[in-house]
Amino acid sequence: MKYGYVFTDPKRSKIVVLTKQGDVEFLSTDTKENFSKAYCLRDISTMKVLYTALRDKNLIEEMDIVDIQELYGKN
């Protein structure tokens, strides 16, 4: 089980995964196995900086930063 913050779409149906190649993938929140692949940081300030950088590079659209524990509780 992970702890920290992740990027999700506003509907909380997808999470952001950063690949080793630096690409961005979106995985469903329907299965808990996908949570282990999510990009997760414990510091929300760092997540905000990363969010701005990814938005500036047009790698992601509007996303929310949420505590991953909220998503674990959803399933």
Regions found by a protein language model. Give the residues of each.
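A short, surface-exposed interaction/processing loop segment used at functional sites
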Residues: 24-36
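Short amphipathic beta-strand/extended segments with alternating polar/hydrophobic composition
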Residues: 16-20, 27-29, 41, 52-55
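Short, mixed-charge low-complexity intrinsically disordered segments
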Residues: 34-75
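Sequence-level motif detector for i,i+2 pairs with an aromatic at +2
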Residues: 1-2, 36
